[in-house]
Structures are given as structure tokens and as C-alpha cells.
Amino acid sequence: MWAQKILVALLIGYAIASKVFQEAKVGDRVVLDLGRDVVTWKRVRDNNKEEYIKYCESGETEPRCKGFVTEDGEPATPTSKAHVEKDGKLIFDPFEATDAGLYSSPDQKPIERNEGGAVSAVLNTHIALTVKE
């Protein structure tokens, strides 16, 4: 019984640890960073719709290269002054109140296999970006 309680406590701890809280002032330059493996970012704002943006090499023309878009490729509204840099960082310049939301990346790999065949799993990191008053 005590082992189950410890397991539940650990799972709750891992779930909380996977969410990072970041405040930003309207008008500031804001940088979100989930690591170098990130090309595509996903966000969910108050409207509960998933929106995507990604880093693109020169010559790529898909809608996600130009700014946040909905799953069907339509520009997200209200718009953001945001882009993804080659190193995977999401930059807002400037940050607007409508940019507040939950940010993550579908590029993060929660399950990894090492050379010996062992499997490890971690929860994807989510950044809750809020407006600092």
C-alpha cells in the first residue's frame, strides 16, 4: 500500500515538473526555449484551438513558416509577431497580451530507447506563458 502512495506522489511530481510557468510584460521581447531538437511549436490560447509555427530553411513556403496557423493552415487570429530560430527558440518581438497560452512542441520525444535497448519515458515540457501585470 505504501508503495502505491509513493508511486502516485512521484507521478504527480513528474506531471507538475513538466509544466514551466513564465510571465512576460506586454511589449517585451520574449524567448521560449525547449531545446535544440525543436523545429515546430504548438500553442493553445483561450479559444482552445491548437496553433502551430515552425522554423523553416530558406525556400520553404508552407504556412507554418510565416507565423502561427491553425491545424488547417489558416492564419491564427489575433496574429503574433513571432518566429522560430534555427536553434529552436520561439521569439516574440514584441510580446502581446493575446500571445498568452500553453506552449509545447510535438518534436519532443517522450519515449527514448538507448543503444542497449532500455526504454525511458519523460513527459513533454509545457510552458504556460502569462501576462505580467
Label for each model-derived stretch:
Residues 19, 27, 132-133:
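Extracellular/luminal ectodomains of metazoan preproproteins built from arrays
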Residues 32-78:
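N-terminal V-set
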Residues 77-118:
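Ligand-binding face of N-terminal immunoglobulin V-set domains in extracellular IgSF glycoproteins
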Residues 2-17:
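Cleavable N-terminal signal peptides of Sec/SRP-targeted secreted and luminal proteins
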Residues 18-21, 92:
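A detector of helix-start/N-cap boundary segments at the beginnings of structured domains
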